[in-house]
């Protein structure tokens, strides 16, 4: 029996794209900081001159799948990380955005064969989002770790 597992220490040579939503940037900026900290501590060059990492900003979470698809389909990246925050309001808008971004990100991964990490927080309140983006823990770190694991795993599984 063959067992395939991704490794966090095997980041050398991985090319990563990060797509971040500007809307709710108080939250998404913190997620990005946590994500970049994780990637850096695991050997990914996160400097502005990096050839391993590219960063793309989109207006909001709804736009994430479109750019994630462009990046994943480019053949330049081993993994795409998506970061966003959708916070429930008083209208059904939350439900529409959450449904579309989650389906869209999943479709990009399936269609491109490139792992796309779903790092879009969906919370009822701003407080809940902030707790997940740094007050209690920073899920951005987890999304970075997931990217490293999936990038390594995909390299180990024969096509």
UniProtKB/Swiss-Prot annotation:
UniProt EC number: 2.5.1.78
> Binding residues for 5-amino-6-(D-ribitylamino)uracil, per the UniProt record?
23, 61-63, 85-87, 118
Q: Would you say which domain of life the source belongs to?
A: Bacteria
Single Gene Ontology BP annotation: riboflavin biosynthetic process
- UniProt pathway: Cofactor biosynthesis; riboflavin biosynthesis; riboflavin from 2-hydroxy-3-oxobutyl phosphate and 5-amino-6-(D-ribitylamino)uracil: step 1/2
In this chain, (2S)-2-hydroxy-3-oxobutyl phosphate is annotated as bound at 90-91, 132
Q: What class of enzyme is it?
A: transferase
Q: Which GO terms describe its molecular function?
A: 6,7-dimethyl-8-ribityllumazine synthase activity
Can you state which reaction this protein catalyses?
(2S)-2-hydroxy-3-oxobutyl phosphate + 5-amino-6-(D-ribitylamino)uracil = 6,7-dimethyl-8-(1-D-ribityl)lumazine + phosphate + 2 H2O + H(+)
Keywords attached to this entry: Riboflavin biosynthesis, Transferase
Alphabetical GO CC annotations of the entry are: cytosol; riboflavin synthase complex
**Carries keyword DNA repair?**
no
Give a Pfam family name.
DMRL_synthase
Q: Which InterPro entries match?
A: LS, LS/RS, LS/RS_sf
Q: Which residues form the active site?
A: 93 (proton donor)
* Role this protein plays: Catalyzes the formation of 6,7-dimethyl-8-ribityllumazine by condensation of 5-amino-6-(D-ribitylamino)uracil with 3,4-dihydroxy-2-butanone 4-phosphate. This is the penultimate step in the biosynthesis of riboflavin.
Similarity field:
Belongs to the DMRL synthase family.
What's the name of the protein? Answer: 6,7-dimethyl-8-ribityllumazine synthase
